[in-house]
Amino acid sequence: MNENIDKVIEYVCNKEIKGKKINAQPLCILLGGLPGSGKTNLVKKIQEQYKERDFIIIDTDEYRKLHPNYETLRKTPEKAIVETSEFSNAIEAELIKRAIKEHCDIISVTTLRATEAIDRILYEPAIKSGYQMEACIMSVPISESGLSAQSRYEKQIANGECPRFTPISFIETSFQGIKNTIQILQRKKNNPTIRIYNRGNGENSMPIEFYNNKKQDTKYSCALEAFINPPKLLDNKSAIKKINELYKLKQSRNANSIEYQSMKRLEELFGVERDKERE
C-alpha cells in the first residue's frame, strides 16, 4: 500500500500543482459545510469571484476514487468511506504541504468538522507562509442537510455510482465540529474573513452570502450565530413530500435498517408524524 500511495501522491501533486500560477500574496480558502449543503456550487461561486486566481481545489472525496481497491470497495459503499479515508487524507496532507510551499492559491473543501487537523495541517502552516485566510461556510439546517444527503445517495445508486451514505448522526456530529472550528477562527489574531452562505432556491442555484464578519450591516453578532441560525428554505409540506419519495425508493430496493434509522431521525427533525405502516 505504501508504494501505491506514494505513486498516487506524486501523480496528484504533479497534476494539481504543475503549471499553476505562483502568487506573491497567496489566498487560502477554507470552504466547508454539512454534507449535502451545496459546497460544490460554493466552489464555483468562489472561483467566479476570484477569476484572477488559479486555485488548487483540494477535496478528499475526489482522491478516494484513486484507491487501488476502489472498484472492489465500491460494491460495499458502507465500508468504502472507512477503507479509503486514510488513503485520501494522506494525499490531502501532502498536496496541502506542497501547494503552500509553492505559494499556490488554495480552496480546501471539507465539512470543517475536524478542527484540530484543519488548524495543524492547513491553517497555521499557511499563515506562516504569508497566506491571506478566508473561511466560506455553507449553513443549512441539519434537517435539510440530511434530506439532501439522502436524496443524493438514492441518485448515486440509481446512476450506478459508488454511493456515499451519510447517517444523520454523522451530520449532527459534523454540525458541532463546524461550530468548534468557527469559534477557533473567531479567536485567531489575524482575524480571517468569515463568510456564511445559504443555498439559493433551486437545486442548481448559486449560494447566497448572508453574513460577512468584515461588514457591519448584518443582524448577526458573529459568524457562529449566523451559522447556527440559517434561513429555512424548505417548508414542512415540501419536506414531507420528499421524505415519502425517499421511503418509496428505499422500500423498492429493501434498504437496510441503518438507512431507516436515519429516515426516522429526519422525520423527528422536521416534526413529521411517522406513518407506522412504513416501519
PLM region spans:
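Conserved phosphate-donor/acceptor-positioning beta-strand/loop module used by diverse small-molecule
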Residues: 129-149
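N-terminal pre-Walker A segment at the start of P-loop NTPase domains
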Residues: 1-20
